[in-house]
Amino acid sequence: ANGLKSDFTTLKLSGKYYSTDEITLLARSSQVNQVRVLDLGDNQLGDEALKILSESTQLLNLEELILGVNFITDKGMKEWASSSNTTLKNIKTLVLSDNKLTDDSLAELVKSLNFSQLESLDIGWMEAGNKTAEAIGASDTLLHLKKLELERSYVDAEGIQALIDGEIAGNLEELNLIANKLGDDGAKVIAGTPNLKNLKVL
């Protein structure tokens, strides 16, 4: 397959105008069963393509899934979050930035048991807000999360307080909050917390 490295573990297919038909073929191909990193950023993927991907029986070894700059909506995200048919149980890195996702579906993603292995989550450049931040703060599923990207979102001081009061905050090594709604109060919350003890990059 075009883009497949010789070790068959990395497949880069960004910017190829792929949509549902191509994803259907990809998800069914036995050639991808060793792929650990799949980059489908900047394509034409919508909710149907997401469902096909998330239920693929060939991508069981996938650990990193890049879906930034596509057309995934709340419907598709909520379906994946609540699905009992998803086969992608080992995703450690998930990039969803710059899709059509709102605070509602992002909060459901965070609460879902389907993403309990996540170490890195990029949900920037969308409509993540306090509901998402509060869900992260209350989460007992994202216990491996070390990197969280929330660039250009709508989290304010109240939301960041809820996020860093939670158990997950203590594990975070990277937290990107550039261009949110934090204001002076939010900055004070971050500066005054002992909870971000492992943070290396802010």
Q: Model-predicted segments: where are they?
A:
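LRR N-terminal entry segment and analogous cap-like coil->beta motifs
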Residues: 1-50, 68-74
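Short, solvent-exposed loop/turn at the beta-strand->alpha-helix junction
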Residues: 17-24, 44-51, 71-78, 100-107, ...
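Asparagine/serine/threonine-enriched low-complexity, disordered tracts
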Residues: 43, 70, 90-92, 134, ...
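Hydrophobic anchor residues at the C-terminal helix/turn of individual leucine-rich repeat
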Residues: 26-29, 53-56, 80, 85, ...
